[in-house]
Each structure stands twice: as structure tokens, then as C-alpha cells.
């Protein structure tokens, strides 16, 4: 038996099944439920499998209507009412968030998820200094050029949400000068709480560290730059599903 196989046809007696991608149509549901029958452990890999990711951007009326009118004509799979996480249809043993998860996280998920050590949030792995006397008045981002490599990106006017995002990725984005967009999902401090609590915490961080007007901040936090990942916070809170235990999220 090969070590790694990419297929919808799952052989018998498989130790671990890695599932990536959201569940968007009835064919996805069929393949997913069929695949998990012959495996011992299921790992949901990446933002799409856990919360829909990029495909959730297609959950708009005009997109659904287009597929409904053309699906029967071209014998296409039927769209579901929205993009669903994997655990809407099957049980998941471990969640591996990230867009994408790093090689280190993949190794930990396969070899020793309980023994993996990570900081509480991305800020704990970033290494940049937070300054009390440097408070930007507006979100400027790269308008002022490349950021100072030593100073916190929030202090420099970047929309960075590393304070509330779970660690483990080793902060490659912020170390390279790009703000964290939250692709790893909420840190353990918020993972079993309502999504409104996480959003309010992000707002408080910016209120404490910046002089950015509340209206500008609220608009920025709901912008396309962040919405693709921040919307996933509500999926961790459960909604009509069971709340995801932080012990099952790497």
C-alpha cells in the first residue's frame, strides 16, 4: 500500500484520511461519506475543509441561480444551499487549519498531534515589538512602503489579527512583513466561545494600540481582505452543529 494516495476511491484499511476542500454539491457529499467508511482516522485539512474558504465566496444568489438553471442541462452535480465544512456530514478526528498548513503542522498531525507545542497565538511567534508610544491614526498598510522589520505591524498601521489567531504556523507572514489575516482560525482562548467575542477582542486590540476611528476600523475588519478568513470564526462556535473542541484542533 502506498504511503500517500490522492483519490476518491478509498481502499480498505486506511490509517489516515486527509480531506481538503469544502462540500459544495451533492457529489461532494457522496464522495465524502463513501470515503470515510474504510478509514481509522479523519483529518480535515485547511480552511476550506474546516470553514468553506474561498469557495464560500460563491454563496451568492446569482451564483446559485446560474448553476440551478444550467445543472440539469449539462448534467452537473446539484449545488447545496451553501458551502459546508466537512464535519457537517462526517465525524472528524482532527482539524488542521491554515491556508495552507505548514509542512511542520502536517508532520505533527500525522505523527504526534498531542505533542505539538505552539504559542497561544500568532503574536507569540512573530517576534516583533509592540510599542506603547506608536499609535497610527489610520490604516495605511503598505502606503508608507515596506514596514519596519522589528516593530509590530499594528503599530505601523497594518490590519493584522495575529492577536486572536491560533499559533503553530511560526508566523511566516508577519515575519515577512505581511499582516496576519487569520487563516489559522481562532486561538484556544476563543475557539469555544461565540464569534462575537472574538470579533470584539480584535476591535479592543486596535482601540488599545491605535487611534484609528471606530468607523474606519469596523469597515476594514469587514473588508474582503479579511472576510474570507474571519467569517470562519462562526463555524468554530458550532451554529447548528456541535462546538468543535479545542483538543481536536491542531
Listing of model-derived features with the role each one plays in the protein:
Residues 56-57:
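Active-site-proximal loop->helix
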Residues 1-18, 33-41, 66-95, 100-250:
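Iron-sulfur (Fe-S) cluster-binding modules
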Residues 21-31:
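Thiamine diphosphate
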Residues 60-63:
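Short, hinge-like loop/turn segments at secondary-structure boundaries
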Residues 48-53:
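Short gly/pro/ser/thr-enriched loop/turn and capping motifs at secondary-structure boundaries
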Amino acid at each position: 500500500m502506498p504511503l500517500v494516495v490522492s483519490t476518491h476511491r478509498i481502499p480498505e484499511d486506511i490509517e489516515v484520511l486527509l480531506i481538503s476542500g469544502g462540500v459544495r454539491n451533492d457529489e461532494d457529499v457522496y464522495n465524502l461519506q463513501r470515503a470515510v467508511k474504510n478509514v481509522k482516522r479523519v483529518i480535515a485539512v485547511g480552511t476550506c475543509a474546516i470553514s468553506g474558504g474561498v469557495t464560500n465566496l460563491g454563496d451568492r444568489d446569482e451564483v446559485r441561480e446560474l448553476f440551478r438553471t444550467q445543472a440539469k442541462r449539462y448534467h452537473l452535480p446539484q449545488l447545496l444551499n451553501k458551502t459546508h465544512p466537512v464535519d457537517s456530514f462526517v465525524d472528524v478526528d482532527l482539524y488542521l487549519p491554515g491556508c495552507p498548513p505548514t509542512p511542520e503542522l502536517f508532520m505533527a498531525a500525522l505523527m504526534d498531534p498531542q505533542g505539538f507545542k505552539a504559542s497561544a497565538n500568532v503574536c507569540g511567534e512573530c517576534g516583533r515589538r509592540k510599542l506603547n508610544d506608536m499609535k497610527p491614526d489610520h490604516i495605511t498598510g503598505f502606503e508608507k512602503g515596506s514596514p519596519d522589520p522589528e516593530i509590530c505591524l499594528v503599530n505601523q498601521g497594518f490590519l493584522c489579527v495575529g492577536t486572536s489567531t491560533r499559533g503553530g504556523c511560526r508566523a511566516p507572514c508577519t515575519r515577512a512583513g505581511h499582516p496576519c489575516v487569520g487563516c489559522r482560525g481562532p486561538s484556544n482562548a476563543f475557539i469555544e466561545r461565540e464569534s462575537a467575542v472574538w470579533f470584539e477582542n480584535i476591535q479592543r486590540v486596535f482601540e488599545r494600540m491605535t487611534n484609528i476611528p471606530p468607523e474606519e476600523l469596523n469597515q476594514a475588519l469587514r473588508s474582503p481582505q479579511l472576510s474570507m478568513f474571519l467569517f470562519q470564526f462562526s463555524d468554530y462556535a458550532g451554529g447548528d452543529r456541535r462546538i468543535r473542541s479545542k483538543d481536536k484542533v491542531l
